[in-house]
From Swiss-Prot:
Transmembrane segments: none
The organism's taxonomic lineage, starting at the top: Eukaryota, Fungi, Dikarya, Ascomycota, Pezizomycotina
Any one of the GO BP annotations: secondary metabolic process
GO molecular function, one term: ATP binding
Superkingdom, taxonomy of origin: Eukaryota
Keyword Cell membrane part of the UniProt annotation: no
Assigned keywords, A-Z: ATP-binding, Ligase, Nucleotide-binding
EC number: 6.2.1.-
Sites where the protein binds AMP: A186, M187, S188, T189, S190, G191, T192, T193, G194, L195, P196, K197
Entries under Gene3D superfamilies matching the protein: 3.30.300.30, N-terminal domain of ligase-like (3.40.50.12780)
UniProt-recorded name of the protein: Acyl-CoA ligase M9
Function: Acyl-CoA ligase; part of the gene cluster that mediates the biosynthesis of squalestatin S1 (SQS1, also known as zaragozic acid A), a heavily oxidized fungal polyketide that offers potent cholesterol lowering activity by targeting squalene synthase (SS). SQS1 is composed of a 2,8-dioxobicyclic[3.2.1]octane-3,4,5-tricarboxyclic acid core that is connected to two lipophilic polyketide arms.
Gene that this polypeptide is encoded by: M9
Length: 541
């Protein structure tokens, strides 16, 4: 195999299986059942035996939680000359139906627990989609009854029924026929500007990305042992959980989902690195406040990769205070579904300036020539634009949207920020910026100010109203239900210019709606206001 991700002939499967290390050592490990694991050799065997199970050119959807089989399924799908797409197990039938239609799904692999919802979605989509039931091909030896799953109205094939007698030589022959420019994945956008679209990326795109994200592991004074609990189908998690883990060969433990057992697993398995969204860091802090022993169990962590939403400086500082070792790093990752990771920091760099990273080797990042706002220090900020070979090929079935996403070959990210000293800084999302009487206000700035108050657990700021009635609306989660809105507004007036918050309205709530990656769903909050006030032009005292 070639030794560079820039080699033109690479496909994702060849690249993922190209690492050189002890192939009998467990690499993919079930965090709930650590005896259930896969070595590289076992993973290759399963990929070889599953490859060819799907009609070439088809899209195969994996509708499952995190599992050590998931990377194997993705590689087997790609080795079959097919395209992978993944969905959130929490999706409703309506969400699944839309995803199936947009991705042109032909097969869906799912668990028995989700088969009813999947069947409803297929019926609603009107498509001819075959359901394949997840069966544990890691530990279960197939019997005659394991090849089909029969229950009530269902009689469906299982993963066991797909296993053939293929071997590594068969697999290599299949892989030779995969052009590196061919489609590999179809990932769903967040749908913040309409219904979710499918981002189609090529094999070459993913190979370049995962080659660029590789950290300086050999320079680390600790063994890399990863714990994964972020959604594997997400663009933040996918390159590491599916490709780089098996390529680089460090022990990786997969949690089905993030829960309160996190600290116990960090301690039990000697975990040194993990991935998280900011909302997860907040949860961990809250758990340690209730159970001091959880703080002790986290001490082995050395690196936390963080993405999915803006990381407030106060939250970052509070999380780092959990550790006795000052060398613990929270490393931000910035990217989009449209191209994966764009910027991050590599070991051993620390950053306390608020930057979200340095550009990946395959990414060019610049600021739009049209300034969007001005910072207090006079610095002009604008929309961040990205260019490079790892970007999407197209929005599947939406050529016009693809054209609109680019400006002279540069992807419009929708993030407002600036670049300085080789680092990238994000101020806010363009669509979230608030305009009050002609003044530009950043929701992230107001949220950061509120997070300075010890009694504030979570906060969200958004624009509400139109024209001269546009103003700031803030939703606040407080530790003390008796927290006075007047105290919150007083704090804001002490910290920011009066024009930013003089007309703001504040709502105390029990929690904030967030998506699977931790982003605040401002549209849901805005809908709640509309339901209560109408069009928002009700006036503020």
């Amino acid at each position: 195999m070639a030794d560079s991700p820039l080699e033109q002939g690479w496909n994702v499967v060849t690249w993922a299986l190209s690492g050189s290390y002890d192939e009998d050592r467990p690499v993919l490990i079930d965090a709930d059942q650590p005896n259930r694991s896969l070595s590289k050799k076992q993973a290759i065997d399963l990929v070889a035996r599953l490859s060819g199970s799907f009609q070439p050119g088809s899209t195969v959807c994996v509708h499952l939680y995190n599992d050590i089989i998931y990377p194997v399924l993705v590689l087997a799908i790609l080795a079959s000359h097919c395209e992978w797409t993944g969905t959130n197990p929490a999706y409703t039938s309506a969400e699944l139906s839309h995803h199936f239609a947009q991705s042109e799904t032909r097969y869906v692999i799912t668990d028995q627990a989700y088969v009813d919802v999947v069947h409803q979605a297929i019926t609603a989509s009107g498509q001819n989609i075959e359901i394949i039931i997840f069966s544990d091909i890691v530990t279960d030896k197939p019997g005659e009854n394991d090849l089909r799953w029969r229950c009530n109205k269902y009689d469906l094939a299982t993963l066991h029924s797909l296993l053939t007698h293929g071997d590594e030589s068969t697999l290599r022959r299949r892989l030779q026929g995969i052009p590196n420019h061919s489609p590999a994945t179809a990932m769903s956008t967040s749908g913040t500007t309409g219904l979710p679209k499918m981002v189609q990326r090529s094999h070459r795109s993913l190979v370049l990305e995962t080659g660029g994200t590789q950290d300086h592991n050999s320079a680390k004074p600790f063994q890399v042992r990863r714990l994964y609990c972020t959604p594997i189908f997400h663009a933040f998690s996918f390159p590491e959980m599916v490709i780089n883990t098996i390529r680089l060969g460090f022990p990786s433990f997969y949690m089905r989902r993030f829960d309160e057992s996190f600290a116990n697993k960090v301690h039990e398995f000697g975990i040194t690195e993990t991935m998280a969204a900011p909302a997860m860091l907040l949860k961990i802090i809250q758990w340690t406040e209730k159970h001091e022993e959880q703080r002790f169990k986290l001490q082995g962590l050395r690196t936390i990769l963080c993405a999915g939403a803006a990381l407030a400086s106060r939250l970052r500082a509070s999380f780092l205070q959990l550790f006795d070792d000052a060398s613990v790093r929270i490393v931000q990752v910035w990217g989009m579904t449209e191209g994966g990771w764009f910027a991050t920091f590599w070991y051993p760099e620390h950053d306390d300036t608020g930057s979200i990273g340095r550009p990946l080797p395959t990414c060019q990042i610049r600021v739009s020539e049209v300034p969007h706002a001005e910072l207090p220090d006079g610095r002009q900020v604008g929309e961040l634009l990205v260019k490079g070979p790892q970007l999407l090929t197209t929005y599947k079935g939406h050529p016009d949207a693809t054209k609109q996403a680019f400006n002279d070959g540069w992807l419009r990210t929708g993030d407002i920020g600036y670049c300085a000293n080789g680092k990238v800084y994000i101020i806010d999302r363009a669509k979230d910026i608030i305009k009050v009487n002609g003044w530009t206000i950043s929701p992230a700035e107001l949220e950061a100010v509120l997070h300075q108050m010890p009694v504030i657990v979570d906060a969200a700021a958004l624009s509400y109203g139109t024209g001269t009635k546009e103003h700031v609306a803030m939703f606040v989660v407080a530790k003390e239900p008796s927290m006075l809105i007047a105290d919150i507004k007083h704090h804001l007036l002490q910290q920011v210019a009066r024009f930013k918050v003089a007309t703001c309205e504040i709502h105390l709530v029990d929690s904030l709606p967030r998506n699977s990656s931790g982003k605040i769903l401002r549209g849901v909050l805005r809908h709640q206001l509309q339901a209560h006030y109408g069009n928002g032009d009700h006036g503020i005292d």
